[in-house]
């Protein structure tokens, strides 16, 4: 049994308070407040996800993060603190791969959101460019989110947390999860000995490798950060043509197959 990493029945104003801990994201540290200017917080009354600002009007996240009455916050670090340059938007339009909400747990878990109006760059808000190349196996990558810092029991922090993990060959994830198809549009990333991982509530957030936005968190084992059970991330590089075409106004584009 595995789970999609989105939190259900989450109330953003009722986050469980987490004592200061060395286990952040799971196994990381509090993020530097200046390292996540592109990070979006998506929420409604029932769900929480992350997202990535790729220009002043567009956010990229996971398709399973689609929710009614969604609000999108930029410039957030501690959810209990309102920052001077914090900005809130809502979706003007949502785009799914192959027009589809028919993504499955293995494939096409990507959603592009056009905001109702452009954001203003500020000290804590700025977009992150799409990748120029795919990541290499062995790359050290950064994950971040407001998801649970404990698993399987959940504890939701006020402050954003980050951790470093590694890109593995896709076959490492196929060995861990035999039901995975042979697709290569998914990145396999984690720590083989366990201890660091994205988890419930981190869905849709970025995987950043060598400063480039390479993946979107979407799937993992029921209990996070277990040995030899890496997480799965939508491979952003494989969807660049689709993303750029949508932004340019070609909403009928379908790529890759």
Swiss-Prot record:
Active site residues according to the UniProt entry: 64, 109, 203
SUBUNIT field: Monomer.
SMART domains: Tryp_SPc (SM00020)
Record protein name field: Snake venom serine protease salmonase
Function: Snake venom serine protease that may act in the hemostasis system of the prey.
Recorded GO CC terms: extracellular region; secretory granule
Signal sequence annotation: 1-18
Protein family according to the UniProt entry: Belongs to the peptidase S1 family. Snake venom subfamily.
CDD domains: Tryp_SPc
Domain called Peptidase S1: residue spans: 25-248
Subcellular compartments: Secreted
Domain of life: Eukaryota
Glycosylation sites: 78
Known EC number: 3.4.21.-
Organism: Gloydius brevicauda (Korean slamosa snake)
UniProt entry keywords in alphabetical sequence: Disulfide bond, Glycoprotein, Hemostasis impairing toxin, Hydrolase, Protease, Secreted, Serine protease, Signal, Toxin, Zymogen
Organism placement in taxonomy: Eukaryota, Metazoa, Chordata, Craniata, Vertebrata
Disulfide bonds listed in the record: 31-162, 49-65, 141-209, 173-188, 199-224
Keyword Signal: yes
InterPro entries: Peptidase_S1_PA, Peptidase_S1_PA_chymotrypsin, Peptidase_S1A, Trypsin_dom, TRYPSIN_HIS, TRYPSIN_SER
GO molecular function terms listed in the Swiss-Prot or TrEMBL record: serine-type endopeptidase activity; toxin activity
């Amino acid at each position: 049994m595995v789970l999609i990493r989105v939190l259900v029945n989450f109330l953003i104003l009722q986050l469980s308070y987490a004592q200061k801990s060395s286990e952040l994201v799971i196994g990381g540290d509090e993020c530097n407040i200046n390292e996540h200017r592109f990070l979006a917080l998506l929420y409604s009354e029932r769900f929480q996800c992350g997202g990535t600002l790729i220009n002043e009007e567009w956010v990229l996240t996971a398709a399973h993060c689609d929710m009614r009455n969604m609000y999108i916050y930029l410039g957030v670090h501690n959810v209990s603190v309102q920052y001077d340059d914090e900005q809130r938007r809502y979706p003007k339009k949502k785009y799914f791969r192959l027009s589809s909400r028919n993504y499955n747990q293995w494939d096409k878990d990507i959603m592009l959101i056009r905001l109702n109006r452009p954001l203003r760059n500020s000290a804590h808000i700025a977009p992150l460019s799409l990748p120029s190349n795919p990541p290499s196996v062995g790359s050290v990558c950064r994950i971040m989110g407001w998801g649970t810092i404990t698993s399987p029991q959940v504890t939701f922090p006020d402050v954003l947390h980050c951790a470093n993990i590694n890109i593995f060959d896709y076959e490492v994830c196929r060995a861990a999860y035999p039901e995975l198809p042979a697709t290569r549009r998914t990145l396999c990333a984690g720590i083989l000995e366990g201890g660091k991982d994205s988890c419930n509530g981190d869905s849709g957030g970025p995987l950043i490798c060598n400063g480039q936005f390479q993946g979107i968190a979407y799937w993992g084992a029921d209990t996070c950060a277990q040995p030899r059970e890496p997480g799965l991330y939508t491979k952003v590089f494989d969807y660049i043509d689709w993303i750029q075409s949508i932004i340019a106004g070609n909403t009928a584009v379908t790529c890759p197959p």
